[in-house]
From Swiss-Prot:
ANK repeats lie at residues 9-38, 43-72. The modification Phosphoserine is found at residue 176. Pfam families: Ank_4 (PF13637). It comes from Mus musculus. Residues 144-164 have a biased composition (Pro residues). It comes from the Eukaryota. Residues 135-167 are annotated as: Disordered. InterPro entries: ANKRD40, Ankyrin_rpt, Ankyrin_rpt-contain_sf. SMART domains: ANK. This is Ankyrin repeat domain-containing protein 40. The keyword Acetylation applies. Keywords: Acetylation, ANK repeat, Phosphoprotein, Repeat.
Length: 363
């Protein structure tokens, strides 16, 4: 039973390698004895179907030389040649130009799906193997110098240059154009494939102002242009609220999460509670209102708001500079009716050296 499962796993690896264009992995699996005509149990696709679908001409040629059946059908009755979109691969499969115009367009309409599969909407990064990579390792190990690499016989330009590693940028929403770019039918625009920019030394902790302004600051004024004029910036710089990672990350970037409690040193357990403030309304009055509402305190009893350990909040700009999960204390006015401070007198009576008679003496 385990041998059968291992055999199916090897066949699935062969189909995956053919879909990615990994010619070395395909050669390794075929030489180890994996059946090139093995079909998937669900859709009936073989490794030749996948190689033709992804337009990997080198893999198609090798599979045909290894005995792959070009007439095998899927569960929908599709042959491998009907899945390709390149004339070069159709010639490799032995399809004439006259037959191509009659059969291929009609079969493509029949196999068109009403949705875009996930493996086509988010294709894997294409496997690119060049002899230069292997020769460079030989040169580093002291091996012989590599022979000059001749250009490929295929007239189609390579999708990616071998010397540069492009980055996958923002893909367009048209999945069909993305599939054509991956298959090499059209040239890739600069928005999809772009080379990495040259790295230059610069300040470490200076993120872009325009990006962080929309996330962490109060949009009180429209953005001011920061284009330099004669080497200097024109106009005042927009207000920027820095963001420091404190180990916990807020769930919603539109809210400012603060930790608030009532200042009472007589209590052994004086825990904080978390409150949320809208970043569009970071004012002192809003902070006072939300804090008193959550703690059940009358705003008239609040003497001041302290940012721990020893900073007093006085105005709206002080509140705008607050970061997520900062600790605040509400300092209340001491009065006889304030039940929170009744425990302060009881702590003296609990001491063993407390003299009740002496406490009532008047001088």
């Amino acid at each position: 039973m385990s041998a059968l499962l291992e055999q199916k796993e090897q066949q699935e690896r062969l189909r995956e390698a053919a879909a990615l264009g990994d010619i070395r992995e395909v050669q390794k699996l075929v030489e180890s004895g994996v059946d090139v005509n093995s079909q998937n149990e669900v859709n009936g696709w073989t490794c030749l179907h996948w190689a033709c679908k992804r337009n990997h001409g080198q893999v198609v040629s090798y599979l045909l030389q290894s005995g792959a059946d070009r007439e095998i059908l899927t569960t929908k009755g599709e042959m491998p040649v009907q899945l390709t979109s390149r004339r070069e691969i159709r010639k490799i499969m032995g399809v004439e130009e006259a037959d191509e115009e009659e059969e291929i367009p009609q079969l493509k309409k029949e196999s068109e799906l009403p949705f875009v599969p996930n493996y086509l909407a988010n294709p894997a990064f294409p496997f690119i193997y060049t002899p230069a990579a292997e020769d460079s390792t030989q040169l580093q190990n002291g091996g012989p110098s590599p022979p000059p690499v001749s250009p490929p016989a295929d007239s189609s330009p390579p999708l990616l240059p071998p010397t540069e590693t492009p980055l996958l940028g923002a893909f367009p929403r048209d999945h069909s154009s993305l599939a054509l770019v991956q298959n090499g039918d059209i040239s890739a625009p600069s928005a999809i494939l772009r080379t990495p920019e040259s790295t230059k030394p610069g300040p470490v902790c200076q993120p872009p102002v325009s990006q962080n302004r929309s996330l962490f600051s109060v949009p009180s004024k429209p953005p001011v242009s920061l284009e330099p004029q004669n080497g200097t910036y024109a106009g005042p710089a927009p207000a920027f609220q820095p963001f420091f990672f404190t180990g916990a990350f807020p769930f919603n970037m539109q809210e400012l999460v603060l930790k608030v409690r009532i200042q009472n040193p007589s209590l052994r357990e004086n825990d904080f509670i978390e409150i949320e403030l809208d970043r569009q309304e970071l004012t002192y009055q809003e902070l006072l209102r939300v804090s008193c509402c959550e703690l059940g305190v009358n705003p008239d009893q609040v003497e001041k708001i302290r940012k721990l350990p020893n900073t007093l909040l006085r105005k709206d700009k002080d509140v705008a500079r607050l970061q997520d999960f900062q600790e605040l204390e509400l300092v209340l006015m001491i009065s006889d009716n304030n039940f929170l401070f009744r425990n302060a007198a009881s702590t003296l009576t609990e001491r063993p050296c407390y003299n009740r008679r002496a406490s009532k003496l008047t001088y």
